[in-house]
Amino acid sequence: MGDRVTVGIVGASGYGGVQLVRLLLEHPKVDIVYLGGEGSAGRPYTELYPHLQGRVNLTVEPVSVEVIRDRAQVVFLSLPNGIACQLAPQLLEQGCKVLDLSADYRFQDLQTYTQWYGEPREDQATAQKAVYGLPELYRDRIRQSALIGCPGCYPTASLLALAPLMKQGLIEPNTAIIDAKSGTSGGGRQGKINLLLAEADNSLAPYNVARHRHTPEIEAICSDLAGQSVLVQFTPHLVPMPRGILATVYATLRDPGLVREDLITIYQAFYRHSPWVNILPPGLYPQTKWAWGTNACFIGIEVDERTGRVIVMSAIDNLMKGQASQAVQCLNLMMGWPETMGLPQVAFYP
């Protein structure tokens, strides 16, 4: 595709979109040539995000498959659920590579999608072509695909914590409990009462208990890894901070003789080719601040010998590894570039 790749972003006005813009501006192999969105069409992008003055000279345009086709080789879709599935088939037909940040192409079984998201779908053939965009698990498939269904933020943190346990049969698979906490940016940029400072500050609250839409996504990938149907218990919480996810996973070990050091060695081996996953040494547990602004995931491991359970803690930036930078990581793989290319390596600290 030549030395540089032209990229369009549809849904550029949201938090996911602006993270993509920030990352792709610094990417050595990419040129942003199109920013699309219906609600903000006609407005200079710097009117939406003034901090990008002098860096972005594009105006947000109405969404047009023909315009995108003529300009962009790769398209990121950062749209609400149920919209990407209307655009992706058309873009693929025009020869574009597509990375979808919504839930539309995370499921091979569209009945599951319809059950949890309430949207009937008629694009089963397209969904079958999609690859789940978690590079640490599906790196080789991503390299060969033209359509990536990028994971949700909670599933990313949860699955990176669970994958070695599920894949290697180290736990009773249906005993997994995920307690996850996310910053307020996970709710998007549109005004919501529970995300107002007066509502969210100095408070910690669970939400969508036993019915969060990321549950079937986690279960589908766990089932694939375990080679059997898996159910998980997943409870998300809202934390009064702008970004970050900490997922704490509990599960019963099949071999109660496994100790913490054994599991750390297993995790290090499992992720030995994954530059963004950091397995912490014994007694050190992850903090969300360590991942701020990066594509990193920090994983800490503990074993409670008294209960026979393993406890795995996983910290990511929900807008980065949980959304935009993971999509860019997938782009790197699709194009045959190093998967670290153009992505921040070190967090802002403190």
Swiss-Prot record:
PROSITE patterns per the record? ARGC (PS01224)
Question: In which pathway does this enzyme or protein participate?
Answer: Amino-acid biosynthesis; L-arginine biosynthesis; N(2)-acetyl-L-ornithine from L-glutamate: step 3/4
Under the heading Pfam families, the entry gives:
Semialdhyde_dh, Semialdhyde_dhC_1
GO CC term (a single one): cytoplasm
What pairs make up the disulfide bonds? Answer: none
Write out the entry's keywords from A to Z.
Answer: Amino-acid biosynthesis, Arginine biosynthesis, Cytoplasm, NADP, Oxidoreductase
Q: Where is the active site?
A: 153
Protein name stated in the entry: N-acetyl-gamma-glutamyl-phosphate reductase
According to its UniProt entry, this protein's organism is: Thermosynechococcus vestitus (strain NIES-2133 / IAM M-273 / BP-1)
Q: Which gene encodes it?
A: argC
